[in-house]
A protein has these predicted regions:
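Serine hydrolase/lipase
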Residues: 1-101
Length: 101
């Protein structure tokens, strides 16, 4: 059994992230895509941290597995980037924010 999240914001402080990593880190995959804005909030200056492990999908669909730290930033899209709301709407080539009927 595993936990998969798509475009998750930071949800706890450093202590939370450490405890989470000890208990579920090897079973958690936190997918991020391109320049998705949501994983960048709340800011780390406020004490929030990501849980591991990031699985980064670039805008061409290439996948990179993170280094196991919650705050790893994969790919060139993560370096002083402009954030994108539209990158939050698509993961693994699928529209994830609504129903298509």
């Amino acid at each position: 059994k595993s936990v998969y999240t798509f475009g998750s914001p930071r949800v706890g402080d450093g202590v939370f992230a450490e405890i989470y990593a000890e208990r579920l880190g090897s079973k958690t995959y936190r997918l991020t895509h391109g320049r998705d804005v949501v994983p960048s909030v709340p800011n780390t200056l406020l004490g929030f941290r990501h849980v591991p492990t990031e699985v980064y999908e670039d805008r061409n669909g290439n996948i990179t597995i993170g280094d196991g730290s919650g705050e790893w930033k994969g790919g060139e899209d993560h370096v002083w980037r402009r954030y994108s709301v539209s990158d939050h709407l698509y993961y693994l080539g699928e529209y994830i924010c609504g129903c298509n009927s």
